[in-house]
């Protein structure tokens, strides 16, 4: 798959700050100690409802990580997948009497357009699950051979499952107890009640072909891959073990990221899969959970269709800590639009207060676990002074414009 078009990132003068992020596995904010090439994997969309604001908020958070690494002089190898074969996609296609391939292609194209409009720096590798099936088949074979996987006792559908206990470390990423894991597995695409499994938590690796479902010929038998293993294989084969950041929404901490790590660690015989597990909060609507079942998803494309400036959307989503569950409201968008207008007015002036202390504060805030709320306030303070015609630095408006673009991704 091809990602969206590249987004220019201005170089910001001054001294960058090393990044610190909350690590779900450690339960604390820790330094992210990347090498010359920083490596990140962020779980992508299942392309049937793209791009809602929950998606957007997650990818904006990890876009900031990308930008901070660039500011620190790192090369960045960023991998993002597309889950272009999975039960929710097939269910939507069946509901709408649409070919699942056509649906996935259309929604993936829409996602690319939305990401480009929001000025998200594209991944180095943008990889679909379908194109990765040969790699996934090979991985399932290795897990079976090592004893980390088994076939269920089912003559009709002898699906392949992963022994969750295979690495001896299962649970280290999410830190949930078994009862919580079982509840979340049932809620989030698992099948704890599947007959023939050795343990309710064991996860699907290869689903044998069923009537009416797409499948691929394989030495494993005709079928299709399980969700968690797709990300394990795509990340492992492109980034290797011990990459810097595994990212996604907080609903992916378990079971998805826990199993992705366990699968990869069983395959590699090494630990850890990622050195930082980082999760973004959920976005609600007017105080309620935003979900497909409630029918209250807000889509970036529809806002753009209503002529909302994508930079106002970006500012509205950045006005809150990325790890917090937040609510999208009309007031939030109004505030983002007003802020954007004031910032653009200020950087269009011939002069303003010195930009240097503002850029320092921006870097300080963003490097401290992506504290975007206080980063925006730092720019607001400069804008207030500039619009009051205080300060005579003729280079300041352009410097602020470039810093806001380079570090926050907001084009003024």
Swiss-Prot record:
Motif ('HIGH' region): 45-55
Sequence motif 'KMSKS' region, residues: 289-293
Gene name in the database record: mshC
UniProt-listed HAMAP family: MshC (MF_01697)
GO biological process: cysteinyl-tRNA aminoacylation; mycothiol biosynthetic process
A molecular function (GO) term: zinc ion binding
Keyword Nucleotide-binding: yes
Keywords attached to this entry: ATP-binding, Ligase, Metal-binding, Nucleotide-binding, Zinc
Self-association and partners: Monomer.
Family membership: Belongs to the class-I aminoacyl-tRNA synthetase family. MshC subfamily.
Residues engaged in binding Zn(2+): 43, 231, 256
GO cellular component terms listed in the entry, alphabetical order: cytosol
Stored PANTHER family: CYSTEINE--TRNA LIGASE, CYTOPLASMIC, CYSTEINYL-TRNA SYNTHETASE
Motif annotated as 'ERGGDP' region, chain positions: 187-192
UniProt catalytic activity: 1D-myo-inositol 2-amino-2-deoxy-alpha-D-glucopyranoside + L-cysteine + ATP = 1D-myo-inositol 2-(L-cysteinylamino)-2-deoxy-alpha-D-glucopyranoside + AMP + diphosphate + H(+)
Organism lineage: Bacteria, Bacillati, Actinomycetota, Actinomycetes, Pseudonocardiales
The record's free-text note on cofactor binding: Binds 1 zinc ion per subunit.
EC number annotated for this UniProt entry: 6.3.1.13
EC class (word): ligase
Protein's organism: Saccharopolyspora erythraea (strain ATCC 11635 / DSM 40517 / JCM 4748 / NBRC 13426 / NCIMB 8594 / NRRL 2338)
Function: Catalyzes the ATP-dependent condensation of GlcN-Ins and L-cysteine to form L-Cys-GlcN-Ins.
Protein name stated in the entry: L-cysteine:1D-myo-inositol 2-amino-2-deoxy-alpha-D-glucopyranoside ligase
Necessary cofactors: Zn(2+)
Entry superkingdom: Bacteria
């Amino acid at each position: 798959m091809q990602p969206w078009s590249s987004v220019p990132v201005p170089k910001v003068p001054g001294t960058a700050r090393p990044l610190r992020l909350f690590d779900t596995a450690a339960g604390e904010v820790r330094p992210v100690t990347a090498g010359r090439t920083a490596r990140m994997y962020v779980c992508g969309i299942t392309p049937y409802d793209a791009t809602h604001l929950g998606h957007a908020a997650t990818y904006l958070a990890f876009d900031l990580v990308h930008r901070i690494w660039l500011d620190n002089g790192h090369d960045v190898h960023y991998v993002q997948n597309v889950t272009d074969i999975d039960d929710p996609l097939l269910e939507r296609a069946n509901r709408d009497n649409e070919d699942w391939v056509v649906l996935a292609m259309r929604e993936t194209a829409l996602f690319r357009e939305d990401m480009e409009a929001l000025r998200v720096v594209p991944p180095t590798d943008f990889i679909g699950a379908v194109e990765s099936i040969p790699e996934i088949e090979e991985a399932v074979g290795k897990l079976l051979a090592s004893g980390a996987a088994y076939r269920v006792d089912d003559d009709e559908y002898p699906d392949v499952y992963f022994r969750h206990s295979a690495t001896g470390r299962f649970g280290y990423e999410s830190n949930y107890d078994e009862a919580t894991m079982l509840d979340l597995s049932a809620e989030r695409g698992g099948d704890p009640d599947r007959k023939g499994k050795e343990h309710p938590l064991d996860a699907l690796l290869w689903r044998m072909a069923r009537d009416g479902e797409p499948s691929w010929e394989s030495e494993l038998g005709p079928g299709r891959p399980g969700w968690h293993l797709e990300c394990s294989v795509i990340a492992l084969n492109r980034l290797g073990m011990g990459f810097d950041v595994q990212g996604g929404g907080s609903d992916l901490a378990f079971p998805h990221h826990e199993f992705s790590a366990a699968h990869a660690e069983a395959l590699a015989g090494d630990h850890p899969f990622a050195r930082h597990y980082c999760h973004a909060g959920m976005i609600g609507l007017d105080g309620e959970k935003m979900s497909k079942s409630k029918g209250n998803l807000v889509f970036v494309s529809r806002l753009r269709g209503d002529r909302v400036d994508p930079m106002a959307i970006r500012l509205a989503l950045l006005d809150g800590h990325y790890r917090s569950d937040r609510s999208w409201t009309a007031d939030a968008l109004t505030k983002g639009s007003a802020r954007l207008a004031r910032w653009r007015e200020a950087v269009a002036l011939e002069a303003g207060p010195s930009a240097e202390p503002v850029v320092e504060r921006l870097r300080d805030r963003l490097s401290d676990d992506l504290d975007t709320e206080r980063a925006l306030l730092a720019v607001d303070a400069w804008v207030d002074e500039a619009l009051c015609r205080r300060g005579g630095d003729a280079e300041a408006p352009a410097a602020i414009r470039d810093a806001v673009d380079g570090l926050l991704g907001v084009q003024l």
